[in-house]
Amino acid sequence: MSEYKETLNLLQTPFPMKGDLPRREPALVERWAAQRVYARMRAAAAGRPPFVLHDGPPYANGDIHIGHAVNKVLKDIVLKSRFAAGYDAQWIPGWDCHGMPIEHRIEQLHGRGLPPEAVQRLCREYAFEQTERQRRDFLRLGLLGDWPHAFRTMDFRTEANELRFLERIRARGLLYRGQKPVNWCVDCQSALAEAELEYARKTSVAIHAGLRVRDPVDFASRFRRRPVLDKPAMLVVWTTTPWTIPGNAAAGVRADAPYGLYDTPGALIVVAQPLADALFASLGVDHALCALARGRELVGLALGQPFFAGRDVPVVEAEFVTLDAGTGIVHLAPAHGAEDAELCRRLGIAGENVVDGAGRFAADLPEIGGLPLADGIARIVAKLRADGTLVREAAFEHAYPHCWRHKTPILFRSTPQWFIGMDIECEQGEADPGRADVTEEAGATGEARKVGKAEEAEEAGPVKTLRASARDAIADVPFYPPSARQRMEAMIDGRPDWCVSRQRTWGVPLPYFVRRDDRSLHPRSARLVEAVAARVERDGIAAWSRLRPAELGVDENAYEKLSDTLDVWFDSGSIHATVYRDAARADTGGYPADLYLEGADQHRGWFGASLMTGCAADGRAPFRAILTHGFVVDGAGRKMSKSLGNTVSPQRIADTRGADILRLWIASTDYAAEMSISDEILERVVETYRRMRNTLRFLLQNVADFDPRDDAVPAGQLLDVDRYALARCREFVDACRSAYARYDFLAVTRLAHGYCAEELGGFYLDALKDRLYASVADGVERRAAQTALHSVLANLLISIAPILSFTAEEAWTVFAGDERDSVFLHTWDEHAPPPDDAALARWAHVRALRPHVTKALEEARGAALIGRSSEAELVVRAPRDVLDALAPLHGELAAVFIVAGVTLETADQIAVAVARTPLARCERCWRHEPSVAAHASGDALCARCRHALSRRARAERSEPRAAVGSR
């Protein structure tokens, strides 16, 4: 065969076997930007159904990490696959730019004490640098999107829109000022949202403390059997926050629970009866039950405040008291606990902060004023011990909320803040996003009622709370995976009123003026907010910092402007209104978004914030579906941590293996669970990639001289195996489309790999090689095979392009012969072959027969009956119905099984017999053919090869055909 090698159709392709991705990929990133591929995609999709993906913006601080890469690549896969499916897929990337981390960084670099405008300017410059840095890294991953119009929450227009959007929520009566316990970080010097908390193990000082009975006679009368009070009596509470003891305002009991009075060596102690034995066992003291009373019978009893000797506190009914731990009696400090505060508010019991914003005890507290928390706790415990009310002190390890930025334990302390109420009723219905200004009637509390022509024209919607509206809004929203719904529902049910105010400088301001005496809002707040927004839109938030109330006609003697800024979760949670529904943007997509896609921690974060803002303003969710992905862990299942040294840099993967390897790992990992990554795992991904790349290379080689405009064979002239290959290609496309549509990217990678390795590499391409290599170059048999391969290659590239974006584009450039063309400009509908169920049914029998043939050939080879399969002749015995199905394909079976011949015989069961063929072998194609005869030169050639050589000789004598691209 070697002397005939040059006469075979062995084509070359510029698509190399080795990907060399780290070197090739950056050039494609530059090309996509220079050729405005995303903009051309949008132009090509004009008039198609829209598919809008909103971007949960990453924070503009530091390099991107592997979690960022997972999130953004998943979004990119969604975007590209929706375009391929025939949608006008839209994604505007963006960044979250305000907040404490950047402000803290500026303080580190420039010190504290700078004027607000200077802080804001430096923060803005720093945030911009960070976004540009992250932009480069994101683009390196192959992300397509509207990058020229990427948003930053610090954009002047976006900041102004946020003020207008907040006013819409306030105008519905959902924004209020209140004194409530909030999560407080002493390092941030600010309140924190629930989403800004991380739970970590903490060892606290836990104490059992007694609250002494003030009136023994009253106390004794509350028990069914009046006890003898020959010792001091006290109700015992248990707390892991002894620093709140000076703030104790009451003791809570469960109304229907039994409480026992127990005689112990030092005192008479009251605790819940079901918890008594465990408690006294832990104390190691003898005890005897003296009397019983229900919790409701103890309500109203006066007790001595444990820290302040002359102060009394009452026993109250508390519905949240449980009997699974502690003493069944709860220490209530309304300034330091949400449930405590709400209960005491209803009962008219006041509370006061005992710790300031810096984490020190209030200066006016005796003995502990001004002390740091740890020192003060030691003094409190010592005082209780000296007073005889310390029952027990012990270390207690538990999960405790920490600041997600500083990793330090937070405090619960009552501060005046602004809240969005979860349980305030308001009328539902989508608000007009363009109507920010309303007239109002404002009461002393500052809560406003909307009055206006637009409202009068609208039919009033149902009245619901924000919590109920949020529950209803997600009722029909699909979640991927479905289990994520429970997390969202739990977030809604357990979410307290949203504290949206922060005590920082770098943030969008609360744009309100309040009275100096009663803190009520200015009656013209709506108009004033619009005036402020106009200035912010021109000059940014610095306009608020330098604004004097008098400039807007506000009496500075009566009113002052707020100094609080908005929670950054409000910034990002409102982008559906401030960015995606901004009338100033030429094309912002539809509303609500078709998909929100973020990590599993975002149910409390961006998902929750977006849901609450959407329902607060419009009574609906800003998304139609939610996809949640898991966190990245190492190969041993451990969380990524710098201290463990197991972090994986997406930049390093892109620079050493290629971004397509990272993308393939992301797509081939079940994102619904934790996503494991390691060098070993990536190496397996590389092997999968190589097999797929080799398939692409084979396909490109064998259509290199094919131009469908001149060379395509009509469907009626295709061999039946080619029609079958196209039918299987359509099945592959349909399966990929379905998997992409349900966001099952793992299924797509399995389909693509299986299609390359089994359907193509393991069947069709093997069957084609002889026809491709040895047939007449422009003969109908070879062109028929190339017609099928051309369609297969186009559809395979479109199907893998959302995942293997760089490789698919590299291959498409060769395939199309035009660098201006892009695989991302094409859809399945343009290229997918029509369904052909009849071909599938015919060839199902061949595929079922193939394992029997393979086994028989292996046995014959093992018995040294044959060497190559082409030396074999097969006798296929099968039932009549199988033979009837195979009969029309009889002429193609030898080529499909790569044997010299196939004979069909009737039998009860399928069986395959192998014999060595007596036919001579063609020296050019190596097929054993009856037509093989000696050439004049003495060479043994089959009729087909003689014809091919003759055609080749005539072609060489004539003018050579001009080279054409493969399309």
Curated annotation (Swiss-Prot):
ATP binds at K642. A motif ('KMSKS' region) lies at residues 639-643. Its main location: cytoplasm. Its cofactor is Zn(2+). Pfam families: Anticodon_1, tRNA-synt_1, zf-FPG_IleRS. Zn(2+) binds at C922, C925, C942, C945. A motif ('HIGH' region) lies at residues 58-68. GO terms for cellular component: cytosol. Binds 1 zinc ion per subunit. Residues 430-463 are annotated as: Disordered. InterPro entries: aa-tRNA-synth_I_CS, aa-tRNA-synth_Ia, Anticodon_Ile_BEm, Ile-tRNA-ligase, Ile-tRNA-ligase_type1, Ile-tRNA_ligase, M/V/L/I-tRNA-synth_anticd-bd, Rossmann-like_a/b/a_fold. It catalyses: tRNA(Ile) + L-isoleucine + ATP = L-isoleucyl-tRNA(Ile) + AMP + diphosphate. Disulfide bonds: none annotated. One of its GO terms (biological process) is isoleucyl-tRNA aminoacylation. The keyword Ubl conjugation does not apply. Monomer. Belongs to the class-I aminoacyl-tRNA synthetase family. IleS type 1 subfamily. IleRS has two distinct active sites: one for aminoacylation and one for editing. The misactivated valine is translocated from the active site to the editing site, which sterically excludes the correctly activated isoleucine. The single editing site contains two valyl binding pockets, one specific for each substrate (Val-AMP or Val-tRNA(Ile)). This is Isoleucine--tRNA ligase 2.
